[in-house]
Amino acid sequence: AQPDQKLTLEFAALRLINVEDMGVSPGGAGAATSGSDVRGVGLVGSIESHLGNATKVKDKKALRNIGPSVTYRLRDASGQAREFQNYMVPVELDGQRVFLAGLRDTPAEPFHYLRIPADESDRIDGWLRLRQALVDPALREKAVMRYATAATPADRPEMAEQLQLTTRRAIGLFAGVEATGLNSQPGPAGLQALGEFVEKNVPAEDRERISQVLLRILNGSLFELLNLSREQAGLARLPLGATTEAFMTQAVLSLSDSFLYPAPVLFELADFKHVQASVFQVAHAQGKTLVYLSAVVLIIGVFQS
């Protein structure tokens, strides 16, 4: 959807209980792949490995209620609608807590899910700040300079300028503002854009090595961008460590997937009030005394038999 496209919001359903099979088959074909190290992600690989079903078929079932969800439709001016299903609380997949934002084009299709990592407060806010910072040219440039300064070896200061250029190109490709070839216009974004750039500009024998270098640079610059967004929100920098690395790995994957998300907005179920009502029908029955008396006689007869 285009940002200026007029869409109509249609509420479809609120489900309080969603029981899903959360079983894990280690190393099996059904295991979720979104928690893998981004440095090992094939740049030309299919997006389906990340933007997929919330749960896959696994060898061992583990049914679990993963909380409330809201379903809604966004309908365009031509009457075409897409259906979305967003969960209220994060779900743990492969040891990573993620928010599931589902979508499908028709009711006959299964939902496919964008997996957004939860921040240290178990909220979606950290990822949203990073997503907004990614489309801000000024913040991207600050992140480039910070990363290049930190990554330049102290004994090789002459590398600083080249590292700045490479970092600027990597994060620009990821943000969709850099062309992937000499004679092309900016087009794809995310990991797909880096993949196209490598295919068009790097000899086949060097592609794997260059891909790894670009991904390390991208990860580092996005980490600086994340901390810049936290500074703007009055938050401290995220410390380096396994938890931060896991968040950044999933953040990079979901940022890449988000460029394929077909809507300019994502609605979050923040709170709701569940009101249950029971209705009892009270009717006046003729001859009720006779009915009650017959019931008493019947009960006495049962105990005396």
Question: Which residues fall in each region the model found?
Answer:
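Solvent-exposed, non-transmembrane regions of integral membrane proteins
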Residues: 1-305
